[in-house]
Each structure stands twice: as C-alpha cells, then as structure tokens.
C-alpha cells in the first residue's frame, strides 16, 4: 500500500497526467490517495468518479506581471491554503507527494517538503511553469516530458515523457477519411470556426470537432460536433490526421499515438508554451506547425491532403505514466 498526496488541476493538462500516473500505480500496488483540488474547477467534477479523499482549496494563480497589485489578495489565499494543506497532510501522513504543476501544486509541494515527505514533480510543457521551476529546487525527483526541457532546470531531471490518460482503447470504424479537430479541454472558437470552413471546402473528408462545450453554427453534413470526447485515445488511433492547439497533453498524445498533425498554437499561452510544445511535432516528423497569423486556408487544405493520405503506423510503446509509477513504487516500497 502506498499513501500518496496529489495536486494538479484547473485544466486537463495538469489533471490527466496525474490521473494517468495513479491509474498505473494502482496496477503495481494498492494506493490510498489524498487529492488537493481547486474550488469550482475541473478536477472537482472529474474526481467524483474516483474513490479518492479530496481537500478543496480556494486559491487562484498569480497575475502577470508578478508585481501586479491584484496578486496581494491571491498570495494571501495561497498562504491560507498552506495552513489547510499542512493539517490535511499531517492527518493523512503520505508516503510521497506527487504534483503536476499549476498554482495548486505550490502550497502542496512546499508544505509536503517542510513536513519531511518525499516530493516528486512532473512538468508537461517544454518550457516549465513557474510553480514547477520553484518546486524543482526542493523536490526529490523531477520528471519532464521533453528532452528540450532539461536546459531550464538547474539540476538533474528525468525525461519520462508525459503520462497518457487512456480511457478506452479500441479502433473506431469511419466510412471515409477523417480529420479530428480539438482545441483542448476548454475548446477553441478559432478552431471551431476553422472546422466549419474546412468542412465546406473538403466534402470528401469527414471532420470530427471537439467543441469544448462551445456552440457552433455549422450545418455541414460532413462535420460532427462533440462537446467533449472522453475516449480520446480511440479517436487518436482511428483518424487519418488531426488539427489541434499546442497544449502539452495534446502534443504528447499526438506523439504517443503517432497522429499526423497540424498544430496551431494558442498565441495567448503563458511564455509561448504552446509554440515550443508544437515544435516537438515537427521534430518528430509528424506534421506541421502553423501560426494563426500566417494561416492561409488553401495552404492548410494542401497540408491536410498530404497528411490524410499518409499510412498510419500505430507504434506500441510504454506509457510514460507507467514509467513514473514504477519510479514512485521503487522509491516508496524499497
């Protein structure tokens, strides 16, 4: 039995790598999980399906630039959260704390180390987030998703890859070539509009759009809109190609399932995270990176034709979640 305290949420990019790792860890040994959530955010909804203990924290991320006046109240909330975390950790007495970034990870990671517990962290993006950079200085082990991330840390890091959350695993049958368009867990109005334009122009293809719950006004018969795709792995394995944003989880999944892809990074991401993540697709010879400001519809259609005609190769490899789970088990159970 391993008792593990976990933090990582607000977005699917932090939440699902943590859940993927926990899923793999419980295949090795029974686990008892204490999960720190952010009040009102995604993880509170998702974790209702899990038999985890949870502690909800009322915290918010810091505004950029960091010296903004509005951060005073946010810092006070984080300090208050540390007191709640301290009591919860003392009561739970974990063997290890595992955090996957985002502002909720900071009070959990710092407090865990102050109380003498092991701390492992995982960074999903090529460019590390502020929380993980800070925590890396005190963590017992740091996992990163990409080789390109190593230069940002002032210590040794372990390149594990980004844990892949696999809900189901089966091939779907489509009656024509299919393009998957996804804008991350929150969706993308830009990609939703782009999907409509492409469906009108490319009647010989079928488009499947994950809208993120956003309404779309498009009546094209070859466009199927889904609010949120639960069994993403099934689609990744079955479509001919994909058009996506450049979130770390999405890029990692594209690489893991070897999906021919066009990545259009969201330009508003912190410190150009998505642009750097997207470059990993070109490094892996999987497809193209297209900036929003440079997007030309006809040129994009040409790229889709190239990628959708490629023969798909599903390469079986170890899930990074398994790699991290084995490292946790090896350390705690030794």
Curated annotation (Swiss-Prot):
<dbReference type="GO" id="GO:0005886">
    <property type="term" value="C:plasma membrane"/>
</dbReference>
<keyword id="KW-0961">Cell wall biogenesis/degradation</keyword>
<protein>
    <recommendedName>
        <fullName>UDP-N-acetylglucosamine--N-acetylmuramyl-(pentapeptide) pyrophosphoryl-undecaprenol N-acetylglucosamine transferase</fullName>
        <ecNumber>2.4.1.227</ecNumber>
    </recommendedName>
</protein>
<feature type="binding site">
    <location>
        <position position="185"/>
    </location>
    <ligand>
        <name>UDP-N-acetyl-alpha-D-glucosamine</name>
    </ligand>
</feature>
<keyword id="KW-0328">Glycosyltransferase</keyword>
<keyword id="KW-0472">Membrane</keyword>
<dbReference type="GO" id="GO:0008360">
    <property type="term" value="P:regulation of cell shape"/>
</dbReference>
<dbReference type="GO" id="GO:0050511">
    <property type="term" value="F:undecaprenyldiphospho-muramoylpentapeptide beta-N-acetylglucosaminyltransferase activity"/>
</dbReference>
<dbReference type="GO" id="GO:0009252">
    <property type="term" value="P:peptidoglycan biosynthetic process"/>
</dbReference>
<feature type="binding site">
    <location>
        <begin position="11"/>
        <end position="13"/>
    </location>
    <ligand>
        <name>UDP-N-acetyl-alpha-D-glucosamine</name>
    </ligand>
</feature>
<dbReference type="InterPro" id="IPR006009">
    <property type="entry name" value="GlcNAc_MurG"/>
</dbReference>
<keyword id="KW-0132">Cell division</keyword>
<dbReference type="GO" id="GO:0005975">
    <property type="term" value="P:carbohydrate metabolic process"/>
</dbReference>
<comment type="pathway">
    <text>Cell wall biogenesis; peptidoglycan biosynthesis.</text>
</comment>
<keyword id="KW-0133">Cell shape</keyword>
<feature type="binding site">
    <location>
        <position position="125"/>
    </location>
    <ligand>
        <name>UDP-N-acetyl-alpha-D-glucosamine</name>
    </ligand>
</feature>
<keyword id="KW-1003">Cell membrane</keyword>
<keyword id="KW-0808">Transferase</keyword>
<comment type="similarity">
    <text>Belongs to the glycosyltransferase 28 family. MurG subfamily.</text>
</comment>
<keyword id="KW-0573">Peptidoglycan synthesis</keyword>
<dbReference type="InterPro" id="IPR004276">
    <property type="entry name" value="GlycoTrans_28_N"/>
</dbReference>
<dbReference type="GO" id="GO:0051991">
    <property type="term" value="F:UDP-N-acetyl-D-glucosamine:N-acetylmuramoyl-L-alanyl-D-glutamyl-meso-2,6-diaminopimelyl-D-alanyl-D-alanine-diphosphoundecaprenol 4-beta-N-acetylglucosaminlytransferase activity"/>
</dbReference>
<dbReference type="GO" id="GO:0071555">
    <property type="term" value="P:cell wall organization"/>
</dbReference>
<dbReference type="GO" id="GO:0030259">
    <property type="term" value="P:lipid glycosylation"/>
</dbReference>
<comment type="function">
    <text>Cell wall formation. Catalyzes the transfer of a GlcNAc subunit on undecaprenyl-pyrophosphoryl-MurNAc-pentapeptide (lipid intermediate I) to form undecaprenyl-pyrophosphoryl-MurNAc-(pentapeptide)GlcNAc (lipid intermediate II).</text>
</comment>
<feature type="binding site">
    <location>
        <position position="229"/>
    </location>
    <ligand>
        <name>UDP-N-acetyl-alpha-D-glucosamine</name>
    </ligand>
</feature>
<keyword id="KW-0131">Cell cycle</keyword>
<dbReference type="GO" id="GO:0051301">
    <property type="term" value="P:cell division"/>
</dbReference>
<dbReference type="InterPro" id="IPR007235">
    <property type="entry name" value="Glyco_trans_28_C"/>
</dbReference>
<feature type="binding site">
    <location>
        <position position="274"/>
    </location>
    <ligand>
        <name>UDP-N-acetyl-alpha-D-glucosamine</name>
    </ligand>
</feature>
<dbReference type="Pfam" id="PF03033">
    <property type="entry name" value="Glyco_transf_28"/>
</dbReference>
<dbReference type="Pfam" id="PF04101">
    <property type="entry name" value="Glyco_tran_28_C"/>
</dbReference>
<keyword id="KW-0997">Cell inner membrane</keyword>
